[in-house]
Amino acid sequence: MRDEHIPETTSLKRTLSVPLVTLYGLGTILGAGIYVLIGEVAGKAGIFAPVSFLIASVIAGFTAFSYAELSSRYPQSAGEAAYAQEAFSIHWISAAVGWSVVIIGSVSAATIANGFVGYFKIFIDTPDWLAITILVITLGIIAGWGITESITVASIITIIEILGLLSVIVIAGDSFAELPGRLEEFIPPLDAQAWLAVALGAFLAFYAFVGFEDIVNVAEEVK
């Protein structure tokens, strides 16, 4: 049921379609997380990496369902800060949550920008600071262009990311034929060391699933 404290009107333009928002959400989940972290998770969990991803996906799934429920009850662009305000009605708590989101977003953006340098230098050998500056300015211009335009660009990039993952699956298609006979190898033994490795891998793998929480921040701009 819609909360009576949430106003029906909004000053933001509702220009985003459901397909655009869906692609935007997929794009924030895919990308740097899934492409970069597979190797990191495998480094921690070894052959048990699929179990780490499975555990992380279950935890992320519960979190995603919580966001879906909250965003339907409180469709505000403030997202997590609005939810905290509705739950506790204490301004400093909602402010702390809001600033935490800003800080986390800044750290994540910086991390991804640093990771981008390695890929960029494959094509053009430039100083790290220059590559990061070009990326930040370019993305800033796209973001300032408008919500519909920027999410359209993000959706196009998402489609490219999905095609990239599908290409990997197709190229490695022959290897999947061996999986049924090797499933037992992916099940961790009842050993503390093995499950510790799985837990460490799951901790990293969770980052590969995050991104869905960004969708709630455009709730007031969806048609």
Model regions and ranges:
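Membrane-interface "cap" regions at the ends of multi-pass membrane proteins
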Residues: M1-F48, G61, F65, S77
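Helix-loop-helix junctions that connect adjacent transmembrane segments
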Residues: H5-K13, P50, D125-L130, I134, ...
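Select transmembrane alpha-helical segments in multipass membrane proteins
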Residues: R14-G25, S89-I104, I134-L135, A192-A205
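Hydrophobic/aromatic residues within transmembrane alpha-helices of membrane transport systems
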Residues: S17, G31, L70, I215-V218
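Hydrophobic core positions of alpha-helical segments in small-molecule transporters
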Residues: Y24, V51-I55, A96, V153-I160
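Hydrophobic/aromatic residues within the transmembrane alpha-helices of Major Facilitator Superfamily
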Residues: L26-L30, V58, I103-S106, F206-F209
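Hydrophobic alpha-helical segments of secondary membrane carriers
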Residues: G33, W99-I103, V153-I156
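Hydrophobic transmembrane alpha-helices that form the core helical bundles
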Residues: E40-K44, S52, G61-V136, I141-G144, ...
